[in-house]
């Protein structure tokens, strides 16, 4: 059964991404971005953190810890993908700047058609086999087909059938999460991922990566003078990543080699662990405390 389930990855992986992106699009309207247009600095900073700082952290960890090729590429792949719709929901619960969260998610998702191949080409080159050519065109086509088209379809639904969009979004995201659970079950049960054999280092590295984002980004945002609601939005956005995109691209790396399982394991483990990286700041700010550890509150005036 597990082997049959694992063999369905070629269908389940793109399907879960289509559902997730359609569900995210069904929550969005152009009005969500009006406040961001008036003050684009928060969006610009969030994108720099997402596209530049997060991959740099992954590169630093991979080099400092001497990660093997598959583990390094897996970590860099997770670092290259944008934030996901779940980050917007957690930002809402944490009383963060929801329009900013949605804006970073949307712009980074639209931009990932260029940024994901670029980050992988620049950062992962030294970890890939000699002669490996990154299939940039195929990556762009798959991102366009499985991310941008469903996202646009969801936004069109919200525009012309707002009464149905909430239910579509809710069930689409639930369906996407259920499919990720099935993908994980198939990978574990079929032996594609051997947790005991892989040992303790891979999950520890992933936890260090996620915890570094959760602890470091708030300090960076405070140092740059951002209010707490912006800090919550940006931190959750970079901590909770759209791992569905990473799962979509796993098959490009180390086909038929053991290292591909390392890439898959990294993506699936981060998908399961990432909410834990976002919960502390969500609860702290949601309960009226400072979004930044060991610092005073900095609420937005008015």
Regions found by a protein language model. Name each.
Residues 1-302:
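Alpha-helical transmembrane segments of multi-pass small-molecule/ion transporters
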């Amino acid at each position: 059964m597990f082997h049959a389930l694992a063999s369905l990855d070629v269908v389940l992986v793109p399907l879960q991404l289509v559902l997730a992106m359609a569900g995210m699009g069904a929550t969005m309207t152009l009005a969500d971005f009006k406040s961001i247009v008036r003050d684009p600095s928060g969006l610009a900073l969030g994108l720099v953190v997402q596209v530049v700082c997060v991959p740099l952290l992954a590169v630093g960890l991979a080099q400092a810890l001497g990660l093997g090729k598959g583990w390094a590429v897996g970590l860099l792949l997770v670092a290259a993908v944008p934030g996901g719709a779940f980050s917007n929901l957690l930002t809402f619960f944490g009383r963060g700047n929801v329009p900013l969260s949605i804006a970073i998610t949307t712009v980074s998702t639209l931009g990932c058609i260029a940024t994901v191949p670029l980050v992988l080409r620049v950062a992962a080159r030294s970890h890939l086999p000699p002669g490996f050519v990154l299939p940039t065109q195929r990556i762009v086509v798959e991102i366009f087909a499985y991310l941008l088209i469903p996202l646009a379809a969801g936004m069109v639904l919200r525009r012309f059938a707002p009464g149905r969009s909430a239910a579509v979004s809710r069930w689409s995201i639930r369906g996407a999460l259920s499919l990720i659970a099935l993908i994980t079950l198939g990978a574990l049960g079929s032996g594609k991922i051997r947790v005991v054999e892989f040992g303790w280092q891979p999950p520890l590295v992933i936890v260090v990566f996620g915890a570094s984002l959760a602890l470091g980004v708030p300090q960076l945002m405070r140092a740059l003078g951002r209010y707490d609601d912006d800090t919550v939005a940006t931190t959750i956005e970079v901590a909770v990543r759209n791992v569905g995109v990473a799962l979509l691209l796993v098959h490009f790396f180390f086909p038929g080699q053991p290292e591909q399982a390392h890439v898959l394991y990294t993506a699936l483990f981060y998908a399961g662990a990432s909410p834990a990286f976002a919960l502390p700041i969500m609860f702290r700010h949601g309960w009226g405390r400072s979004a930044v550890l060991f610092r005073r509150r900095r609420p937005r005036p008015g």
